[in-house]
Amino acid sequence: MKANRIWCFFAWRMVVRASFLKEMDSIFVSAIRQNVQHTHSALLAKLKEPPDPDDENSWLCRISKKYDACGSREYSDKGLKGTYCPEDFCCSKTACFYGSCGSWCHDNWALCSSSIIYHDEYSYGKCNCKRFQENCDVNAICVHANREDGGAYCQCKEGYWGDGKSCKIDFCQLQPCGAGTCTRTDEGYKCDCPETHKLIVVEDKETCKAKPDFCAEEPCGPPSMVENCVNTDDSYECVCKQGYEVRNGRCEEIDLCADKPCGPDEGVHECVTERQPKLRYRCTCKAGFDLTTLPDGVSQKCLKNFCYEEPCGTRDLVESCKSKAYGYSCLCAAGAMVQVINGKEKCIKADLCRNDPCGPETAVIQCYSHGTSYRCLCKAGYTEVFVNGKSSCQKGDPCTLNMCGGNEAVQECTTDGTAYGCTCKPGYSIAIKHGQKFCNPEEECASHCGSAAAVKSCEILDSGGYQCTCNPGYVMRYSDYVKGCVEGNQCSLNPCGEQEAVQRCIPEGDTYDCECNPGFVKRVLPDGNFICADPASCVGNPCGSSDAVDACIAGTSTYTCRCKDGYTPQSIGSKLQCLPESTDQTDFDSKHKPEDNKGRYSKGTIALVVVGCVALLGIIAGGISYARNRGGERDDEDLAPPPRSTRERRLSSMGEGFENASWASSVSMIPSAPAPPPSGGIWS
């Protein structure tokens, strides 16, 4: 029995427990459902609530929360005028509560009782559209704010804008600006257009119109010239790359040469505009014009070279010619002077005898020009003497005038009245200056010409240099180690050229001849000597003299000639030369053909020169042979006679007839002046 009671107790307990749990679950689920429903209702209510108006002035009336403003009432810290609702009892915007007592609120202020205070105008649900919507604009509606602190406000109808109490037409609703931005104004609206559009006014109304794409068809030109094309309101603008400029609405090449910056066409061969690495122009000038850099250091111009045609005169008279902007000036060589002829300068041979530098008529037969200086022909009893480089006729014979030098140098001086000879003391040797010999310190000539045994003559030149003539068996050699006359002949110096080109060198007295290997030709060098050269080379100036030749250009199989104005390349046999344009081939061949079958020129030439009414006779090159081609061989490279040898060039017009004077040891005889010819004429 007792066990049954215990079992019943536990059974009952379990039933009660189950019932309690079931009831609790029911309560919990119900609470959750209520909470969800409440939340859902709140969300729906919130979604249905209209938003607050944009403008505070849109409100007609409003339910206040605590501490919110009560209409137009003012607040005083003395508590006389209530403005804020300190507790939760306010039910309208103008409901006022202050203190523990209250009464109806009036326009000003009132004492308060314990009752809730309402403003009669808005209290008890009177804040609604039914009562106040007449305060809205005719183009507005009244809207209830369905929320805890709700109220009523005005809202402009669609197509209008404002605070609801005053509504204006909303022109922006019609999107009058198109792609632009429309902004409402009191007067209407305004448009702000994007860069792709422009603002236009049509019938006093603004709108945005799309700009045409003027650049679509590449009006500025190809991309290689154009940096950018920019559309404007009514057109386009071109931005060109370096080296190009806008012309006629397109990018065109900048032609820096269009304005002829190089100068007039007469002097410009070519003007080229260069665009890389930077924009510039380049000039090449015609013959007779010089490319000149202007003072800005950048610009160039072809300026006329007024010296190109050698207006100052022949080269022997001219030291230099300086071309200027509008003319030239001449600097004449020694023995020449500037003379203005028809307003232009020219160097003419100076009349150095004009002031009778040789002396009085009692002493002088004649004063005559001699190179860039003058010489004196003296009467009997007078001798030509040089003092400080100037010649004059001094009374006395050569020996009494110490022509050989001072006693310290001269062993003996002998004279026959017209010629004199010098015997020098040891340590001195014969030297020549101004055509007159004297005893000079031996080491002076030895240091320039070589030993006394090797040197035939040592001539001191006006320039300060030395001209040496070697004895037979000696040749002149200049090198880093040897200078002067050394033992050997002309061929010992290998003058004919490289070994592969030379078959043999043939010595001929003080000169030589060359025989060349097959494939090489013999040419004449500017100094009159020969050399074996490659026929395609320019060795030996095969094109001719510098007066005619602008350039010789070597090739692989032949050479070519570029000639100066007035000359043209012409073939003479197998040789190409620059010759005057009027040169006849037959005349040229006959003028340059050797007189005998061995290629030798005449051995002696007699020159008759007439000065005023006096005939002057002189032997110019007696006994000198121009033998240059042995065995009768003809060489087309050898058409003109070479210049005179060193010995020939050394002879002056005063001494040529007396070169046979003795030069044995240190004794020599030389005339102080040439004897008058049998015809009674005089020497010049």
Curated annotation (Swiss-Prot):
Knockout-associated phenotype: Conditional knockdown results in decreased invasion competency of parasites. Decreased capability of parasites to form moving junction and secrete their rhoptries, measured as a decreased formation of evacuoles, vesicles that are formed in the host cell when parasites are treated with cytochalasin D (CD) which causes an invasion arrest. No significant effects on intracellular parasite replication. No significant effects on parasite egress from the host cells. No significant effects on parasite attachment to the host cell. No significant effects on microneme secretion.
Segments passing through the bilayer: 604-624
Domain EGF-like: 168-203, 211-252, 441-480
Superkingdom, taxonomy of origin: Eukaryota
Glycan-modified residues: 660
PANTHER family per record: COMPLEMENT COMPONENT C1Q RECEPTOR, EGF-LIKE DOMAIN-CONTAINING PROTEIN
Assembly information from the UniProt record: Monomer.
Entry protein name: Micronemal protein 8
